[in-house]
């Protein structure tokens, strides 16, 4: 389903800064996700990809994979350029859960499998997360690196890496 770079896991950081991004060539189409994790002078890059996916799914997968790479509870500052993921996790998810994973219009929540995975990960991980939106493709070095990793994920999905 997903692939990640074979680099060591950051095992017990006190504070981790994470940048995530997703990419999709066509929507749906081949997609990729990428994340940059930094703590105490150590950096880790992870990425992966899937065929027949969407940009929103890749944005969510980037967040899930980045947080899952942290093996101990820690304080996280997570930068992302996806309003969908940011609002979903900080505003909408509480109502969705209360309504049995349905929107206010009573429609099933899109990408519910990933929302449920992210929700379970947040509950079980013990991470304290400060969610921060950053404008994509606007020169932020961390976001640009996450974007490049997401595009590498697309290439991996296409069998070019």
From Swiss-Prot:
Subunit info here reads: Monomer.
Q: Which PANTHER family match?
A: RIBONUCLEASE H1
Q: Which GO terms describe its biological process?
A: DNA replication, removal of RNA primer
* Species assigned in the record: Polaromonas naphthalenivorans (strain CJ2)
Sorted UniProt keywords:
Cytoplasm, Endonuclease, Hydrolase, Magnesium, Metal-binding, Nuclease
Location(s) in or outside the cell: Cytoplasm
Task: Write one Pfam family the protein is assigned to.
Answer: RNase_H
State the protein's purpose: Endonuclease that specifically degrades the RNA of RNA-DNA hybrids.
Domain of life assignment: Bacteria
* Known catalytic reactions: Endonucleolytic cleavage to 5'-phosphomonoester
User: What is written in the cofactor note of this entry?
Assistant: Binds 1 Mg(2+) ion per subunit. May bind a second metal ion at a regulatory site, or after substrate binding.
* Protein name per UniProt: Ribonuclease H
Q: Spell out the InterPro entries in the cross-references.
A: RNase_H (IPR050092), RNaseH-like_sf (IPR012337), RNaseH_domain (IPR002156), RNaseH_sf (IPR036397), RNaseHI (IPR022892)
Gene Ontology terms: cellular component: cytoplasm
Gene name per UniProt: rnhA
């Amino acid at each position: 389903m997903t692939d990640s770079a074979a680099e060591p896991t950051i095992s017990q950081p006190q504070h981790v800064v994470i940048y995530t991004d997703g990419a999709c060539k066509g929507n749906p189409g081949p997609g990729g996700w990428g994340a940059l994790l930094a703590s105490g002078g150590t950096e880790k890059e992870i990425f992966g990809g899937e065929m027949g996916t969407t940009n929103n799914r890749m944005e969510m997968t980037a967040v899930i994979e980045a947080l899952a790479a942290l093996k101990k509870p820690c304080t996280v500052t997570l930068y992302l350029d996806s309003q969908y993921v940011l609002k979903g996790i900080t505003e909408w998810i509480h109502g969705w859960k209360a309504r049995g994973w349905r929107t206010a219009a009573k429609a099933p929540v899109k990408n519910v499998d990933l929302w449920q995975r992210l929700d379970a990960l947040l509950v079980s991980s013990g991470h304290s997360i400060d969610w921060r939106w950053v404008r994509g493709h606007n020169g932020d070095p961390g976001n640009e690196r996450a974007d490049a990793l997401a595009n590498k994920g697309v290439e991996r999905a296409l069998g070019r890496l």
